[in-house]
Each structure stands twice: as structure tokens, then as C-alpha cells.
UniProtKB/Swiss-Prot annotation:
Keywords: Membrane, Nucleus, Protein transport, Transport. Residues 94-267 form the CRAL-TRIO domain. It is found in: Nucleus; Prospore membrane. PANTHER family: CRAL-TRIO DOMAIN-CONTAINING PROTEIN YKL091C-RELATED (PTHR45657:SF1). One of its GO terms (biological process) is protein transport. The gene is sec14. One of its GO terms (cellular component) is prospore membrane. This is Sec14 cytosolic factor.
Amino acid sequence: MSETISDPYPLTNPNAPLGHPGHLNSTQQATLDSMRLELQKLGYTERLDDATLLRFLRARKFNLQQSLEMFIKCEKWRKEFGVDDLIKNFHYDEKEAVSKYYPQFYHKTDIDGRPVYVEQLGNIDLKKLYQITTPERMMQNLVYEYEMLALKRFPACSRKAGGLIETSCTIMDLKGVGITSIHSVYSYIRQASSISQDYYPERMGKFYVINAPWGFSSAFNLIKGFLDEATVKKIHILGSNYKSALLEQIPADNLPAKLGGNCQCPGGCELSDAGPWHEEQWMNKN
């Protein structure tokens, strides 16, 4: 069995839009009930809660058949990847060393209570990274962190916010990224993005791209026509004058100083993992 959450936390959010737990019309409720019933008939017993099934349904615009196919594909991948074993046994001992060449970390929350995730692509040096770790372990760590997001971070954030939190606020820093470095990490980024999109759908709350190089906004304008309107509204492409935009969404005390905030965690924000998930009154007790 995989790790489970034994401590209660809010299962709905009064401010959530239609299609989220506690905010369904009659058609959506019927589709949710049908999806759960079909999966139970197929022998599935885990991850059949409303919040999980609704994420798959929203990702497929409440098309029952497509949502079922997506869920079943995800369950097959979880078994093949060994996700349940990963949750119990994975240890990323090289994390601090990896962080020097590829900083990626969760750090406190935004004004809506979402965990903030920071990724700094400009620091990536795959040659040095692969002297410390392997592509396989990097992917395992990615999946492990997604699981901890669901098992520990979201429940703690939900308790503190007083309502269900099921998305994160991402800051992707492109400072120092050039054409050469983008090409070298494209394979990893593509694989990581595929895992996120296919197996952890509807986890994006806000997405800020900062220090975007010249031409990035134009390139994004070309592809945003293929994205649904709700997704486009979540994405903000910013240049080097990003500080005010970030501070509108993230309290200064929660934003690392190197990104324009006031926070200077001892030992560095990128290794602190500071947030409600480590605060006694909000974290899982078991």
C-alpha cells in the first residue's frame, strides 16, 4: 500500500470555480459518479476520491471516456514506474549537490495558500549534474516530489488556508538561459512536462516565467492559441522587471530575496523546504 493521509483537511474550497469539489452542476456530478462506478467495476480501489477524479475530468473537459482512458493510463504508469515503492523508499541524498546546478524547490505559499515552486533553468549544467546523479534518479525525484505535494504539502496548505488547496504557484526563472543550454536540457524538460501533464493533471494554479529572453513572449503567443483559455490566464510571461508582479501574488516574506522578496532562510531558501508542511499546527501528525 502507498502512504496515505490519515489527518483530516478541508475537502472543498468556497472560492473554487465550477468543476471542483463541492462546486458541481448536476451533469458534472453524474459524470463523476459514473467515472467512479466504471473504475470500481474494473477493479480499481485507490485514488477514487472526488478531488482526484475531478482533476482527470477537468483535464478532459468532463468527457467520461477520455477521462477514464487518462486515469487508466496513469494507473498503468504508476505500477510500471513503481510509484508506491518510491514513496516509501526513495532517498535523494545528492539533493544539495544537484541544487548547485539545477535549483528546483518548494518554498512557502502565495496569497491564496498555494505552495510556491521555484525552478531556475539558467543554472542547469547537465554534464556536471550527471557526475552527481543520473537522469533516472532525477525523474524519480520529480515523481517523489509530486507525490509529497499531494500527500503532505497540499493537506498542510489546505489546513492553514481553511479550504482545499490542490494547485501550486510556479516560478520558472530563465535568467542565463541561452539557445545552447535550452537545447541540451530539452529532452529532460520534455519528459518532465509529459509526466506532469499526463499523470498529475490540473496542478497548475499560477505560472510565472521570469527573466524571459527577447522573443520568448512572441513565441508563447504563437502556441497559446492551442491552449485553453483557463490555462492561458494562469501563465504570465515576464522579463527582468518581474518583482512587482510576483509580489502581487506572493508575500514578500515568503519570496526568496534573490527573486525580489525578503526571505533569507538559513542555509538558503532552495534547501529549506520551508512551508506549512513543516509547521507543527498544519503538518500531518502521522
